[in-house]
Structure formats: structure tokens, C-alpha cells
């Protein structure tokens, strides 16, 4: 939300979303367009929160949180009543936390052509998996596979191979 108008619009949409809707918040910190208040406000609406290994440093500072990345993730998960917290560490690994479980997967080694869109592909595949009844672990595996594939193609919207669809 880069302007007060867009922020109010997003909040209005979140308030009107059915309680059954899965509300996803990718913190996606850019420039000067965020502060602790904005992040907290959207976390209060979120069911799923995605943060990467760079963004967690900023959130840790803004929220005055101490501890390891895992401790910060678990604190946010509990404090905001999230169903899932997705933590991505680029070419190294990703972890998805729920109140009851943790799913850790190393990032597959692929010939990287372009990383643009990999995070969004990860998010989309994970949410799709959850919404279609997959377990957190199954949805996580799909998310890792799809995002790795995206990295092997130029551009953010590569044509998916049949084995990646559904």
C-alpha cells in the first residue's frame, strides 16, 4: 500500500472478505512504502504471512524482536494467530510453520536463468495446494518445485510443463 487511498482500499477488501477466505500477506518490503504500523495492520488480517531472509531483518528491527529467524517466525505466527508462516531463504531453503508443525525443504539446485517471479510462483503454488486440500508439507513441496522451475526460464510467467499443472 503505497498511498493512504490504496491502504484504505486494501483494508476495506480485507474487512469484506468472507471469514472462510484464505488471506495471504507477502510483506514484500519496497523502498519507503512501509512502516511497523502498516505491517502490523495487515498481519492482523492475514492467515498466511510470507517473509524472506532479507525482509526478516527489517521486521525484526521494526518490531524489536530478538532471537533466531525461527524464533522470530514462531513469535509472529503465535502473536498474529496465523495459520501458516512462509520463510524463504532464496537458493538455500524454505521453511513453512504452522501452529502444530514445521516443514523444511532445501532449495533444489537448478541452472538459474531468471529469478523474477520465483517468490510469487512459490506463494501461488502453496496457496493453491492448501486450497485444494493438500497438506502443508505437500503444498510446500509443490511450491518449491514450481519456484525452482520458474528460475530456469526467462521472465516471470513461463509456460508451465504438464507435470507442474495441478
Residue ranges and their predicted role:
Residues 1-102, 134, 164:
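Ribokinase/PfkB-type carbohydrate-kinase core domain
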Residues 80-84, 106-166:
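Conserved post-catalytic alpha-helical subdomain immediately downstream of the catalytic base
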Amino acid at each position: 500500500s503505497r498511498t493512504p487511498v490504496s491502504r484504505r482500499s486494501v483494508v476495506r477488501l480485507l474487512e469484506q472478505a468472507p471469514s472462510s477466505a484464505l488471506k495471504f500477506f507477502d510483506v514484500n518490503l519496497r523502498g519507503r512504502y512501509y512502516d511497523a504500523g502498516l505491517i502490523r495492520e495487515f498481519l492482523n488480517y492475514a492467515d498466511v504471512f510470507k517473509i524472506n531472509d532479507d525482509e526478516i531483518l527489517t521486521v525484526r528491527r521494526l518490531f524489536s524482536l530478538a532471537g533466531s529467524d525461527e524464533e522470530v517466525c514462531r513469535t509472529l505466527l503465535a502473536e498474529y494467530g496465523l495459520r501458516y508462516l512462509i520463510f524463504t531463504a532464496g537458493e538455500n531453503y524454505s521453511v513453512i510453520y504452522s501452529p502444530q508443525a514445521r516443514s523444511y525443504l532445501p532449495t533444489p539446485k537448478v541452472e538459474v536463468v531468471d529469478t523474477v517471479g520465483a517468490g510469487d510462483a512459490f506463494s501461488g503454488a502453496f496457496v493453491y495446494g492448501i486450497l485444494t486440500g493438500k497438506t502443508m508439507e505437500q503444498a510446500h513441496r509443490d511450491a518449491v518445485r514450481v519456484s525452482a522451475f520458474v528460475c530456469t526460464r526467462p521472465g516471470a510467467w513461463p509456460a508451465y510443463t504438464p507435470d507442474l499443472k495441478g
